[in-house]
């Protein structure tokens, strides 16, 4: 492993500070990495020319292209496009997990080079403060995937490439060190090197060659060169700027300082970065120690330093977060309260928070425009999504401000509750609940707490804790069924028109599930229900099949309960199967229609549209789409028009099996709209020029076979997900006819033609509203008359005017009379009124409340006599089901007795 280093003149040494083994050309006491060595490049660039991020990315890819590597385009930062275990890409190797790294699928090129934007939110609280931490960074990587049959290159070549690249940009080889290490993760491990120069780590070279097992390390057949070069850091050392942010964000920083009026103090920033580089900030949640060290070094008061650095840190945070957001939103993440959408919203709201701290008058979308324009020089696909990004940020910023307004009252109420419990600060889980469930950021909690003399107790690493809790997809536990049978041949793929078949029975499990060697029964999957039908034995007995299920490639045919007794001695028998043809045809049309609806929705609503779930049905089908706002009626109509236009155009529906890598190279990750399909080979369903998906379902030969698509309704199923329901073919026609019947019947009721129905309904509705106004006016007059008649019934008890009556009025009048007697007319201090329906209203003024009598208690006390209950505010409460009015006098007297007892 070290042969190449020796050839390059490197000698093995041991760091006198950390004890790590490293390699260096010159003799040195330390390993070259922080905290053993201080940053030496700040104010002193160490390359032959200065590179911005775009420049070093071009240089990196060009170098490795010249050395036999195929450049590939970046993958989306949304890893869920091709894998189920994580939400976001955290390193370039994520691009190739699990399919390539498992050896199941060949890589898109071998060897290859990629500059992969990666997102890690585990240090989000350190961004802007240390000079180097970022939420989004570009990992330059060259990868090689080696097998015994096809070796590409391994350790020596990897070390040589790294050395030659760093030297090619002007870094003195005598300043480069290679620190020996060991990498472990994701069930694999192997030796590695951390490459440092001038006090900063620039790259990591990992050689994945072992599987981690309970019995120790086991060599794996696929040996992977997994490298990661920090391109932002390389740009930083080439420029020698005070922070990595200055080297990375270019004109975005300049524009932010211009509009905010913030001046960047290079002396403070440089010293802060140097000292932060000497500290293991990742393990320090409280950054006060860093601030103290910087203050001591510069002979400044720590509080004054914090005040000085806060706006500079905010500039860097806004620049970093808007870059992260640009990739997130351009790659299809919709901010929401769950999964990857939660992480996007977290970053977005932190951005707005720091914009507010800077006192910016600009909107978030104004800042995003700056970032999008800057990034688009390297990533044109981001500019293609500019309108979408701006629409989302405008909407999300508005939602954020609405959330803050609503949330303040919740925080105030919580403070009162905690004070009553003699608590002096918020527990962390309550702060997390404020943020997770109500969207209230800790800074808002802190501000309200100060106003109410309460300790917010916000952890320094609050956002890091939040992000860590939401970064990985929760694995769904599936109860496995062990089946020792060969996989079932899915014969319906050979001929989708086949409706009968013959097969051999291989076994029966759980007394009611038949396993065959082959089948045309479609097993439930991809949102498509299974086929149903019959299996006929050689003796003529017919078994009804109610459900087909696939487990690890084996199809289980569920037999109806009433036919389970017919399964004796069936194993080994040749049977005849038949599926319900009408059901299959309708589900087939529904499935192809779903592809058209998705494609039409994407054209109408935007490229961000992605399937979040689907369920095909006989009467109606639904599709869930990632979208950031409600779908309007006009948009629904346009989606329906487009989908039916494509039905009428009678496009071919092409179905073909592809090698997974070939399919991804040809079509991209839009293949996985309907979910991630496993396997080396995938079945691709393409409607040319309209839609393409990896799909295992049954489909029409042409779109014209669908007949008609009728959109029924939309629904918001969760934050960031919109549902479309629609009916297809005969079900669609029936829905159109049902709607026509409703219109015709309504027209008959009003005695007008259908064209006049909207105008007639509007006229009747307006007349009804006018009648309601008149009725309410008359009710008020009747209530006033009733009030006058009740004044003679008021009793003075112990100095308080009390009225208790049963009235023949409706609920609304009852409430109005009770309130007016106390508040408007002021003839009673307390009014307790019941109507013949058993409703009760109790109203009082502050004189009664000051004696400790609350109307909610009064209503429930009376309910003990009359059988009902209720509740409300201290001076106004309501109740119902006071049905035992024979005890009304007894109930009223109990209240009067309390009043008599007052001193």
From Swiss-Prot:
Domain remark from Swiss-Prot or TrEMBL: Consists of three domains; the N-terminal catalytic domain, the editing domain and the C-terminal C-Ala domain. The editing domain removes incorrectly charged amino acids, while the C-Ala domain, along with tRNA(Ala), serves as a bridge to cooperatively bring together the editing and aminoacylation centers thus stimulating deacylation of misacylated tRNAs.
Family indicated by similarity: Belongs to the class-II aminoacyl-tRNA synthetase family.
Primary residence: cytoplasm
Leader sequence residues: none
Cofactor(s) it depends on: Zn(2+)
One of the record's GO cellular component terms: cytoplasm
GO biological process: alanyl-tRNA aminoacylation
PROSITE patterns: AA_TRNA_LIGASE_II_ALA
Subcellular location: Cytoplasm
Residues the record lists as binding Zn(2+): 591, 595, 695, 699
Cross-referenced InterPro entries: aa-tRNA-synth_II/BPL/LPL (IPR045864), Ala-tRNA-lgiase_IIc (IPR002318), Ala-tRNA-ligase_IIc_anticod-bd (IPR018162), Ala-tRNA-synth_IIc_core (IPR018165), Ala-tRNA-synth_IIc_N (IPR018164), Ala-tRNA_lgiase_arc (IPR022429), Ala-tRNA_ligase (IPR050058), DHHA1_dom (IPR003156)
Protein name: Alanine--tRNA ligase
Role of this protein: Catalyzes the attachment of alanine to tRNA(Ala) in a two-step reaction: alanine is first activated by ATP to form Ala-AMP and then transferred to the acceptor end of tRNA(Ala). Also edits incorrectly charged Ser-tRNA(Ala) and Gly-tRNA(Ala) via its editing domain.
Pfam families in alphabetical order: DHHA1, tRNA-synt_2c, tRNA_SAD
């Amino acid at each position: 492993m070290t042969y190449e280093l020796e050839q390059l003149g490197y000698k093995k040494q041991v760091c006198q500070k950390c004890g790590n083994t490293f390699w260096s050309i010159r003799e040195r006491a330390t390993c070259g990495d922080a905290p053993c060595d201080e940053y030496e490049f700040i104010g002193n660039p160490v390359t032959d020319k200065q590179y911005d991020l775009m420049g070093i990315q071009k240089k990196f890819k060009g170098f490795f292209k010249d050395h036999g590597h195929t450049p590939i385009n970046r993958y989306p930062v949304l890893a869920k496009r091709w894998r189920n275990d994580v939400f976001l890409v955290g390193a370039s190797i994520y691009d190739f997990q699990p399919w390539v790294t498992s050896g199941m699928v060949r890589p898109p090129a071998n060897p290859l080079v990629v500059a992969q934007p990666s997102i890690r939110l585990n240090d989000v609280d350190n961004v802007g403060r240390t000079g180097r931490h970022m939420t989004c960074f570009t990992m330059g990587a060259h990868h090689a995937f080696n097998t015994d049959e096809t070796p590409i290159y391994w350790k020596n070549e990897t070390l040589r490439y790294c050395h030659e690249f760093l030297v090619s940009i002007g870094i003195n080889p005598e300043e480069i060190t290679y620190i020996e290490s060991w990498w472990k993760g994701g069930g694999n491990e192997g030796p590695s090197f951390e490459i440092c120069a001038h006090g900063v780590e620039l790259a990591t070279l990992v050689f994945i060659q072992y599987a981690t097992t309970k019995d120790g390390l086991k060599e794996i057949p696929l040996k992977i060169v997994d490298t990661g070069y920090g391109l932002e850091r390389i740009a930083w050392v080439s420029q020698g700027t005070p922070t990595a942010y200055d080297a990375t964000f270019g004109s975005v920083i300049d524009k932010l300082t211009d509009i905010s009026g913030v001046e960047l103090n290079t002396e403070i920033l440089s010293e802060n970065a140097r000292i932060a580089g000497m500290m293991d900030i990742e393990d320090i949640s409280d950054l006060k120690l860093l601030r103290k060290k910087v203050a001591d070094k510069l002979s400044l008061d720590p509080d004054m330093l914090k005040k000085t650095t806060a706006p500079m840190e905010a500039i860097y945070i806004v620049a970093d977060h808007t870059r992260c957001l640009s990739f997130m939103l351009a790659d299809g993440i919709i901010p929401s309260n769950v999964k990857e959408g939660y992480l996007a919203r977290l970053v977005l709201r932190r951005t707005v928070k720091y914009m507010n701290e800077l006192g910016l008058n600009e909107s978030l979308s104004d800042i995003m425009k700056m970032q999008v324009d800057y990034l688009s020089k390297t990533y044109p696909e981001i500019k293609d999504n500019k309108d979408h990004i701006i629409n989302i940020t405008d909407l999300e910023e508005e939602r954020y401000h609405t959330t803050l307004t609503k949330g303040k009252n919740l925080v105030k109420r919580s403070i009162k509750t905690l004070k009553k419990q003699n608590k002096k600060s918020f527990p962390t889980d309550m702060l997390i609940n404020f943020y997770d469930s109500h969207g209230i950021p800790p800074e808002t909690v802190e501000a309200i707490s100060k106003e109410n003399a309460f300790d917010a107790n916000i952890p320094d690493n609050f956002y890091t804790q939040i992000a860590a809790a939401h970064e990985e997809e929760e694995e769904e536990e599936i109860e496995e069924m062990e089946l020792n049978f060969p996989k079932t041949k899915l014969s319906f793929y050979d001929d989708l028109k086949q409706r009968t078949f013959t097969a051999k029975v291989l076994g029966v499990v759980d007394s009611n599930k038949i396993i065959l060697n082959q089948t045309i029964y479609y097993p439930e999957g991809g949102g498509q229900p299974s086929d149903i039908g019959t299996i006929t034995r050689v003796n003529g007995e017919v078994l009804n099949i109610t459900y087909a299920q696939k487990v690890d490639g084996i199809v289980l045919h569920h037999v109806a309960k009433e036919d389970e007794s017919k399964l004796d001695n069936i194993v080994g028998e040749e049977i005849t199967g038949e599926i319900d043809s009408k059901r299959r045809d309708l589900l087939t049309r529904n499935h192809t229609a779903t592809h058209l609806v998705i494609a039409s929705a994407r054209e109408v609503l935007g490229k961000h549209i992605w399937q979040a779930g689907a369920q095909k049905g006989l009467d109606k089908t639904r599709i869930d789409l990632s979208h950031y706002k409600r779908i309007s009626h006009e948009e629904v109509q346009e989606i329906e028009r487009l989908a039916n236009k494509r039905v009428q155009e009678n496009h071919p529906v092409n179905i073909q099996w592809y090698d997974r890598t070939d399919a991804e190279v040809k079509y991209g990750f839009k293949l996985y709209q309907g979910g991630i399909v496993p396997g080396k080979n995938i079945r691709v369903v393409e409607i040319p020029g309209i839609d393409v998906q990896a799909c295992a379902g049954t489909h029409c030969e042409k779109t014209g076979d669908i007949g008609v698509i009728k959109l029924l309704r939309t629904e918001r199923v969760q934050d960031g997900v919109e549902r479309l329901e629609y009916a297809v073919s005969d079900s669609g026609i029936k829905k159109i006819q049902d709607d026509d019947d409703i219109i015709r019947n309504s027209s008959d009721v009003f005695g007008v033609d259908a064209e006049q129905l909207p105008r007639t309904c509007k006229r009747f509705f307006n007349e009804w509203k006018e009648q309601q106004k008149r009725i309410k006016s008359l009710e008020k007059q009747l209530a006033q008359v009733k009030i006058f008649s009740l004044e003679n019934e008021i009793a003075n008890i112990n100095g308080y005017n009390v009225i208790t009556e049963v009235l023949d009025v409706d609920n609304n009048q009852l409430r109005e009379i009770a309130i007016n007697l106390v508040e408007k007319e002021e003839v009673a201090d307390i009014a307790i009124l019941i109507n013949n329906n058993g409703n009760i209203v109790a109203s009082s003024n502050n004189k009664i409340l000051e004696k400790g009598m609350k109307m909610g208690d009064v209503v429930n006390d009376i309910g003990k006599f009359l059988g009902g209950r209720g509740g409300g505010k201290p001076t106004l409460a309501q109740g119902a089901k006071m049905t035992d009015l024979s005890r009304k006098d007894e109930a009223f007297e109990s209240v009067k007795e309390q009043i008599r007892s007052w001193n």
